[in-house]
Structures are given as C-alpha cells and as structure tokens.
C-alpha cells in the first residue's frame, strides 16, 4: 500500500455526487430451510464480494441477508468520518436482519475481513439468538506480506493527520486469481478521488487512515469480549493472505471458549477468499459448518 496525503487540497469535498454516490444496496434472498445467514462485507468493500457465497447458501435452502455497511458508496469525505459503531448498527438494525432475529429459526452470521469482527460483535451482543459465526480472513492487524507499512502509520491514525491520509490499494488487491485481479487492476489503476464510478462493483481504491483508527478501537472493544464467547465459531483464512497473517485467526481461535470451533487454512488464495480461487471450498466449508451446528455438532 502506498500513502497519499491531501493537505490543503480538500479534493474530496469537490467531488460530484453523480460520480461518488454509487450504491450496491445489499440484497436478501429467501430460502426454504428455515435458517438465515447474515453476510457482512469488508471495510471499503461491497456486498457484491459476498454474492457468490450468498447464491451458494441460498441454493442450499438458506435465507441470506447481506446489508451494505454504513456510508459505503458515499464519497471518501463521508466514509472517512464513519465510526465502527455506525458500521455495526447498519448490520444489526437492517430491516431483514431484524426480521430474521425476531423469528424462530437458526441465524448464522459470517463476515469478511473487518466484517468478521462485526460478526463477532453481533454474536456477542445477541448470543442467545446467533447460532454460529464464520470469520473469513478476520482482520485485527494489517500484518500481511503486502502491508508492511501499515504498522508504521498506526501512530498517524491516532492524530488529526489521519483525516488527510489514505492508503492506495495496490496489486494483488487481496486476490490471487489472475483474471479477477486484472479486472480490479483496470479499475483501481485508473481511479482517482474524483472518479470512482465502479465502487459498487469493486469497492474503494483508497482506504482512509481514519478507518485504521476505527479498526484499532473495534479490536480493543472486541478483545475484552472474546474470552467470554461460547457461540460455535469457524475461521477460514488463506495461508498466503496478503493483507493479514494467519496470526489473526489464531488470535481469535485461542481466546474464544466455544465448544464447537474450527480453523481452516486455504493454500491457493489471498485475502478476499469470498471471490478468490477457492471460493467454492469456502462456500462448502461454511455450509457444512452450519449444518453440523444445527445438528448439535455432529457430522
């Protein structure tokens, strides 16, 4: 990741709404087996990155709800002021999520990257209602092989300078599949603060450093609660994750007190495992986990 500073430019406030507001409003798919899966996309990502998993699970009979996180699709000048609590509430208070929670059937929650942490917060707050949780490439720390500079900018994230700093996404963009990576690169390499028309499909090409600070606050909040969590949990991550090392999954696995817990590693993917080369395996492992949990942990 490279870093961009915008001191004195205030470029983001001059963006045209027609070029910066491009929404993927999320989606809901009705199923027939009485169970619901809530999918949470990653920070600066889009519900589109969860669509393959959603379609797979829906074909297995699950109702699937995938909200758009708060302020995703807005300009970076809006997104950079978003608190992690707003992101969380945009999931918890989503109409279809509330409908599922008010029902009687099993409710599972799965999240990608920072979305995995929001899934854990939901499982902790609604422990009596959440049947199981899946964490896909959970991101507590940016310590992957393609994010060597992230730790050096954490001190910046704790100062007002954070409002003027952005990480620029760089290859491989969390994706090992060359065809998908090429499509993302075509968009990201030509994107600027003024032109982000494909945010709804590919997510933001820039990552506000303010959100690095929000991640720190979220991790601080969640770390105090992991040791009391007993909800069945599944963690899936690529061994070669370019954004976050497998230490992230191990950190969670070692602290939760769930009787049913499993950690699965992939060997031909990078960070965004919901769309990468082993997405079929991810979908199968998720559905198998949900089925076992509904069956009392038995295969």
Task: Locate the predicted segments by residue.
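Conserved alpha/beta-hydrolase
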Residues: 54-76
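Catalytic active-site module of serine/aspartate enzymes centered on a nucleophile-bearing elbow/loop
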Residues: 262-299
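Catalytic nucleophile-loop/oxyanion-hole region of alpha/beta-hydrolase
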Residues: 74-108
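Active-site nucleophile elbow and catalytic-triad environment of alpha/beta-hydrolase enzymes
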Residues: 22-24, 207-225
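Alpha/beta-hydrolase-fold enzymes
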Residues: 114, 121, 125-205
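Short alpha-helix in the alpha/beta-hydrolase fold that links the catalytic acid
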Residues: 53, 231, 245-254
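Short beta-strand/loop motif that positions the catalytic acidic residue
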Residues: 229, 235-237, 241
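Acidic catalytic loop of the alpha/beta-hydrolase fold
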Residues: 240-244, 272
């Amino acid at each position: 990741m490279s870093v961009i500073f915008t001191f004195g430019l205030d470029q983001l406030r001059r963006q045209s709404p027609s070029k910066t507001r491009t929404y993927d409003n999320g989606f809901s798919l009705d199923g027939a087996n009485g169970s619901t899966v809530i999918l949470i996309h990653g920070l600066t990502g889009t519900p589109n990155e969860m669509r393959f998993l959603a379609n797979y699970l829906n074909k297995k009979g699950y109702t699937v709800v995938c909200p758009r996180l708060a302020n995703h699709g807005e300009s970076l000048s809006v997104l950079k002021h978003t608190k992690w609590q707003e992101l969380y509430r945009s999931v918890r208070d989503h109409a279809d999520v509330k409908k599922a929670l008010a029902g009687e059937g099993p409710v599972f929650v799965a999240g990608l990257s920072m979305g995995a942490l929001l899934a854990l917060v939901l499982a902790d707050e609604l422990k009596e209602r959440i049947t199981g949780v899946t964490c896909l490439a959970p991101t507590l720390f940016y310590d992957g092989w393609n994010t060597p500079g992230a730790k050096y900018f954490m001190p910046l994230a704790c100062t007002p300078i954070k409002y003027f700093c952005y990480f620029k996404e760089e290859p491989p963009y969390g994706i090992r599949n060359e065809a998908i990576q090429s499509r993302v690169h075509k968009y990201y390499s030509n994107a600027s603060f003024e032109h982000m028309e494909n945010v709804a499909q590919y997510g933001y090409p820039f990552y506000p450093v303010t959100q690095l600070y929000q991640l720190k606050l979220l991790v601080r909040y969640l770390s105090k609660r992991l040791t009391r969590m007993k909800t069945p949990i599944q963690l899936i991550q690529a061994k070669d994750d370019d954004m976050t090392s497998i230490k992230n999954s191990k950190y969670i696995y070692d602290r939760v007190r769930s009787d049913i817990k499993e950690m699965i590693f992939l060997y031909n993917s990078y960070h965004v495992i919901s769309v990468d080369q082993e997405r079929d395996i991810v979908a199968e492992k998720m559905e198998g986990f949900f089925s076992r949990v509904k069956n009392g942990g038995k295969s």
